[in-house]
Amino acid sequence: MSKVTVVGAGNVGATCANVLAFNEVADEVVMLDVKEGVSEGKAMDMMQTAQLLGFDTKVVGCTNDYEKTANSDVVVITSGIPRKPGMTREELIGVNAGIVKSVAQNILKYSPNAILVVISNPMDTMTYLSLKSLGLPKNRIIGMGGALDSSRFKYFLSQALGCNANEVEGMVIGGHGDTTMIPLARLATYKGIPVSKLLSAEKLQEVVASTMVGGATLTKLLGTSAWYAPGAAGAFVVESIIHNQGKMVPCSVYLEGEYGESDLCIGVPVILGKNGIEKIVELELTAEEKELFAKSAAAVHKTNEALKEVGAL
């Protein structure tokens, strides 16, 4: 019996749970929320689509009842307030740090062997907070950001090329933020052909720029954070772990010398499997890419310092 818990039944959490159920990633999906009735109602709504969509995953909703999350294999943490228009990810720290820390501690009381997938923002910092405050091995704490950013990168590449997004390969590393992510245009391909041979340098730079502000663009349009792609990205990471797929996915993970950086969680390609992070993949970066990664890491370090300022670490 495989079991996944999603903490936070808001837009992102509910989307993640729905994708997990529809794709039958686990036998049971539990949604937990602090607001009375929300997760129960959404779980019931999802279960009433089972005969329409043809899945048999059991979806359970509960209000702050962590006992119902017991023995989860993977737990997705989406808790926290969403980013409002004009709000920086850094401004979220004061509120979300306390929420994420409390959630993670409660989860581990009932699922001490769970692998944690963090979606809460600022994601790199919340992943780092979880790792530092819980004392778990680093393979069991994973930030989702790179999976989402890479999907957005592939979307914008496919739009520029006029092709199916599933035929494009592209990767984003670095921090999960508008100014810290690094879309690796040099390595992007369409059916094995370097995209740089198909798009002008100017057009490729437009794609990179659109990717970097992808989240902010949606926030302006929606008036709140996006949820379909973030929820699906979380489910994608969970499926890679639960089904031991060995996929290479960019995720925010704890570095200890890899890419010349230490004591932070930041987006790099990893192999995901039943143990969570099976391996960190070190790419051969150009001098320019190395410089961008170092700047991104410095920005993430600076954001992490706020954890001490608010007393979270």
Swiss-Prot record:
Family annotation (Pfam families): Ldh_1_C, Ldh_1_N
Entry's EC annotation: 1.1.1.37
One GO biological process term: tricarboxylic acid cycle
GO molecular function annotation: L-lactate dehydrogenase activity; L-malate dehydrogenase (NAD+) activity
Binding residue positions for NAD(+): G8, A9, G10, N11, V12, G13, D33, N96, I119, S120, N121
Keywords: NAD, Oxidoreductase, Tricarboxylic acid cycle
Family per similarity comment: Belongs to the LDH/MDH superfamily. MDH type 3 family.
Name of the protein in question: Malate dehydrogenase
Lineage, highest ranks first: Bacteria, Pseudomonadati, Bacteroidota, Bacteroidia, Bacteroidales
Gene designation per UniProt: mdh
